[in-house]
Amino acid sequence: MKKTSLFFFLISLSFYQLKAQIVIDNNAPYDNPSWMVDNVLLGGGVTTSNHSYQGDSVQIGWFDATNTDLGINSGIVMCTGDIYELDPNVVPGFVGVQNTVTDPDLLTVANSVPGMIGQTFSVTSINNVAILEFDFIPTSDSLRFRYVFGSQEYFTYENTQYNDVFGFFLSGPGIAG
């Protein structure tokens, strides 16, 4: 009987798959958006200036997702709430960040959503915004940006006026596309 029980226990473990978990940090130096742009976001061959961050300090930090299914091993994380809510070891619950940050480009993106989902509403404001801006000059003729966008609210507010949006805006001479 013991051998049979042990056999079935070992067989059941063979179907168990271990997954790594994302690590979130916004302690120094990850609490400094300028440092993170220069040392985490951008690789070599880029000169940066005019760093600015708008939002609450709990909305930005660093993540390590090595050995997860996220698709990016590590980088900068920005969130509409507290970034620590993304950590699976934190008790779930949304902690919204109430700030007065707004951006006309993000509002335009938000207003493009209704037509894409077959709706006719108008978005009049954006909330819980985090904006990281900087100027950069690359030493080469191309630039690559990898990102993952996620929404905790997607299934709750699908096809409504409450949509999470993301924008990556480039401007300057010679920008095409």
Give the role of each language-model region.
Residues 21-177:
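Aromatic (Trp/Tyr/Phe) and Gly/Pro-enriched flexible surface segments
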Residues 1-24:
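Bacterial Sec-dependent N-terminal signal peptides
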